[in-house]
Structure formats: C-alpha cells, structure tokens
Amino acid sequence: MIRLDKICIWTLIVCFAGMIWSGSLVKPIDEMACYTLLAMGLMDCIVNHRWRAYRPLLLVIAIMAGYVVYSTFKGFNTLPYIVMDAIIELKPFVPFMVILVIKPQLNLTERRVLKGIAIVNIITVLVLYAMPVFRDYTLQLHLMFLGTTCFISMLVYLYCSIDEQGHVSPADMTAVLVMLVVGLGCARAKYYGEAVLAIFFLLLYRPGMSRGVKPGYWLLSLMVLVAVGMVSWNKFSYYFLTGNGDTIDPTVAETFARPVLYATSGLILLDHFPLGSGLASFASYASSAHYSSLYYEYGINNIYGLSESYPDFICDAFYPSLAQFGVVGVVLFITFLVWAFRPATRLLRLDPQRHRYHYVIAALAMCFILIESVASTMPMQTWGLLAMAIMGLVAAQAPATRAVQPSSVQLNHLITYRT
C-alpha cells in the first residue's frame, strides 16, 4: 500500500534539507520536488478518481496550454522554449494545489525531523557567514540565499512547534526569533523588510485587533509600513532610481537591466493587450536561453545584462515576466494569490486562538513571496516552492467552503491505493 500523503511529506523534507544548497550544488532539487508532487496529484486523480478536487490545478494547466498556443502564433521564440517556459511557470502552483488536496498531516517524528533540519540550516548559515571566500568563490552561493534559508527555516520551525491548542512554547518562540535574527547577517534590504513584518506578526499581532478601527491599530500599522519602507529604501533607490549614483538621474535607467525590465514590461502590457507577448518572450529564463526577438523590437538588446551575448540579468525579477501574460495574466495571478490566502482567513475566523499562528505563517509566506519577487525569481526556486508548500499545509487545515462527497471525506487524511 502506497501512502501519497507520506510521499508528499518526505518530498518536502528532502527539499527542505537541500534548500540551502539548491543555489549552487544541487540545483535540480526544486524540479525534483515539483515533479514528484505533480506525479502524486496525477496518481491521486487516476487511482482515487479525484479529478474534481484538482480542478484549480487542471485549470492552471489548461490556461498555460492556451498560452503555449497563443505564444506560438506570436512568434517571439521557438516552440521548445515556449513549452520549457510553460513548465517553469507552472512550478509555483503545483506545491500549493497538490498539498491542498492531498492534505498531508505531520506526525510527531516528522515534525521533529523538520525542526532538526531547520536548526542544522541555521548552523550552516552561521558557518557560511564565517567563510566568505569558500562561500563566494567555491560554492558561488549568494548571501541572499542565506537570508531566505533563515526565513523559510523559521516558518517551518514555527509550523512544527504549534500544539493542538494552537500554542507555541516560549522556548520554541525564542528559537524562531533567533533564526530570524541570524538571517539579518545576509545584509539584504528585502530581508530587513520581511523581518520587520515577521516581528509584527509574531510579537504584536492579535486576532481581531483591527475591529472597531481603533486609532492605536492604525498607528501601529503605519509604523510597521514606515519601518519596512525605511529598511528597503536604499535598495529600492539603487535598483530603480539612482543606480550607482547618489542622486536621481532619469538617464541611468538606460544602463541598468532591472529598471529597463520593469519599464519595458509596462510597455508590453500596453502594446500586447490583453494577453501579453507570450511565453519565452520576456524576462524569463527561456527568453534568455534562446534569445527572444522581442528584445530587439524594444531596442533593449544592447543593455548590459540583457544582450544576446550576455543575457545574465534577463531572468532577474519575477514581476516583469508577468508581461508575457498580459493584463489578463496579471489579473489571474492576483486572483490566485487572493484565493490561496482565503483558507488562512477562514481558519482565523473559525478559531482565532487555535489558528492564530497558522494565519501568521500563511501571511508571512505570502509576504515573503511578494517581497522577494521584486528583485528575484524566488517563486520559481526552492525557497519559493517551500513557501507555497507551507501555505498549502495551512490551507489544507481550513474547512471546505461547501460540503464534499463522502468518498472525498474518506480520502482526506489518508490517500492510499493498493499495488
């Protein structure tokens, strides 16, 4: 007898254990985890006849297939690279949607294993902080990945520390905060913003604190937003306004890849309304692996990092790649984010005290994805996939919005089939 729920759990455990090395030594680990989860979902559909439960995932696949056809007619890249991009773009959706349906439940042993891996990850980060030459030149591991490793490890540790009543022990909360502090060593403005939000949700947030629109709540919210803005401003200015200079220079955008990507993505949304320029055409790995003709059309093929001879900065941020899907794609992506977060809000309404930390974890995972996507393709990488998986674990605990068939209830917590 094969238990699909346990295969899902151990797939996530292996992915979590290799997370810190997926930026250098074991890069295929995110593909391995994603394809394994997709195979589990397909097996669940075929063996347990649960096609209806996977309708959201099937809808995403159908939309992506439609974009493959559309992109072929647009003609900015060849079919193999269009298909490659479609597969890559599917990756963030698979962990959340498969886990949401299979609903794996962590037992005590699995929680201990995950907490142990989280601690090992933090120790490894500290060691790599102390070995900059080995880290930067031998492993070629960017400091950004150490910060994201700490943040995801913190979320996993917190999730595994919640007891049946929804409480987290003082010792575990201390460990969570220590993990958060260790991540500050990455010296990344994005992480500082995430850390400010994490401190707010972990130490200050209380369910229902916004009821009655109390002035204190709005003042606290404003202070958090100001703090996030302050710790993030230098990097925002560097990437989008001044570049290497000390003052705002309107001409500097022509010599820096990321501002050009963002500016051009806006033009593409207007010029290729409403469905965008198509897959493998802009700001994606496939559009750099086989250089897209769209870069010539917009005259950005000579920008440093965006040229055909040196395309290393093309796949540098997630949001510009949404221009490939047009206004329709942007609306669909926002709709997905809202839909994915709704189960966490249902949990909070169901039992605010028991599910407070589940809501916090989902909120922080969402914030992590949104912030990291500004200047990286994190949703497509191991850290982003694990963030989506964590949101899936939280969402799987929420009650369904409507009654399900008895056969589905029977399969909720134990997904099996006989060999």
What are the residue ranges of the model-derived segments?
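Aromatic-anchored transmembrane helix interface
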Residues: E31-L38, P56-Y70, N77-V101, G116-A118, ...
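Transmembrane alpha-helices of multi-pass inner-membrane enzymes
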Residues: Y359-T419
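Transmembrane signal-anchor hairpin modules in multi-pass inner-membrane enzymes, especially those
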Residues: M1-V69, P104, L108, C160-P170, ...
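A membrane-periplasm/extracellular boundary helix in multi-pass inner-membrane enzymes
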Residues: V181-C186, L203-D249, L267
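Alpha-helical transmembrane segments of multi-pass inner-membrane proteins
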Residues: P95-R135, L141-R206
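Helix-loop-helix junctions and helix-breaking kinks within/between transmembrane helices
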Residues: M19-A33, D136-F145, P170-G208, G229-K235, ...
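Interfacial juxtamembrane loops and adjacent helix segments
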Residues: S281-F318
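Hydrophobic transmembrane alpha-helices and their immediate junctions
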Residues: Q324-C367
